[in-house]
């Protein structure tokens, strides 16, 4: 993932990690860590209320994929994954999603800490509070094999098939969760109790064999909902 800021240009020098602009961030709440910590998918959370939308949390899978430690990432915008080959039109698509507070999924060229380029299937999605105010952005990354150009399509088809196993109510809950709403707001939108929403989310996670809400959001966006 890269450049979840507004319109600040990426470094573009071809030297991964060259942009070391950093802001001070406070430790995130436990529920933010719970969102991504156990996910096998490389995931991060950023705070758009702070200057330059810096990362406030990453998981171990992100370190395993990119080579960057938590200490090297927190407080920085994700543009440090960009380099000379990063496609500017795809960067613009991510920025547009951030500006409009809409989920966006692109396959973009990024660079690991050691300079290795990789095709990155990047998801960026908003997270709202109970008053429908933007809190954070969730980002997740999956390395795509350039030798398998249809891999992205296969993931989308698989995600769509997974969602077909859900009941209509479970699909409604999943759709609202993927849009960034938390349980209280989902409950209000559907006229359900918060306890019932939590029950449906739990059943969805179990049925789809997912570990975290971040994984659920990615599946939903990949499926096109």
From Swiss-Prot:
FMN binds at residues 77-79, 95, 110, 141. InterPro entries: PAC (IPR001610), PAS (IPR000014), PAS-assoc_C (IPR000700), PAS-like_dom_sf (IPR035965), Sig_transdc_resp-reg_C-effctor (IPR016032), Tscrpt_reg_LuxR_C (IPR000792), WH-like_DNA-bd_sf (IPR036388). PANTHER family: PROTEIN TWIN LOV 1. Light induces structural changes; in the dark protein is compact and resistant to exogenous protease, in the light protein is less compact while protease treatment generates an N-terminal fragment corresponding to approximately residues 14-156 (the LOV domain). This is Light-activated DNA-binding protein EL222. GO terms for biological process: regulation of DNA-templated transcription. The modification S-4a-FMN cysteine is found at residue 78. PROSITE patterns: HTH_LUXR_2, PAC, PAS. Residues 102-156 form the PAC domain. Monomer in solution, probably binds DNA as a homodimer. Residues 51-77 form the PAS domain. Residues 159-224 form the HTH luxR-type domain. Residues 183-202 bind DNA. CDD domains: LuxR_C_like, PAS. Transmembrane segments: none annotated. Keywords: Chromophore, DNA-binding, Flavoprotein, FMN, Nucleotide-binding, Transcription, Transcription regulation. Residues 1-10 have a biased composition (Basic and acidic residues). Residues 1-23 are annotated as: Disordered. Gene3D superfamilies: PAS domain, Winged helix-like DNA-binding domain superfamily/Winged helix DNA-binding domain. It comes from Erythrobacter litoralis (strain HTCC2594). Has reversible, light-dependent DNA-binding activity. Upon illumination an internal FMN-protein adduct is formed which changes the protein conformation so that the previously sequestered DNA-binding domain is free to bind DNA. Binds to sequences within in its own promoter when illuminated but not when it has been incubated in the dark.
């Amino acid at each position: 993932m890269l450049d979840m800021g507004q319109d600040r240009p990426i470094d573009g020098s071809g030297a991964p990690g060259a942009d070391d602009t950093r802001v001070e961030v406070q430790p995130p709440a436990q529920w933010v860590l719970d969102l991504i910590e156990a996910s096998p998918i490389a995931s991060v959370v950023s705070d758009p209320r702070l200057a330059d939308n810096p990362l406030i949390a990453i998981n171990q899978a992100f370190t395993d994929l990119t080579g960057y430690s938590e200490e090297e990432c927190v407080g920085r915008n994700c543009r440090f994954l960009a380099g000379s080959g990063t496609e500017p039109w795809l960067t613009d698509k991510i920025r547009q999603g951030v500006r409009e507070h809409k989920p966006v999924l692109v396959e973009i060229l990024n660079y690991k800490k050691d300079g290795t380029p990789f095709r990155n299937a990047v998801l960026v999605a908003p997270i709202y509070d109970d008053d429908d105010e933007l809190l954070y952005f969730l980002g997740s990354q999956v390395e795509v094999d350039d030798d398998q150009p249809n891999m992205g399509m296969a993931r989308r088809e698989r995600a769509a098939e997974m969602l077909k196993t859900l009941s209509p109510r479970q699909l409604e809950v999943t759709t609202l969760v993927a849009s960034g709403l938390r349980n209280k707001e989902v409950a209000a939108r559907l006229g359900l109790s918060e306890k019932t929403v939590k029950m449906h989310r739990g059943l969805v996670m179990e049925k789809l064999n997912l570990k975290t809400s971040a994984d659920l959001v990615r599946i939903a966006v990949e499926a096109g909902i």
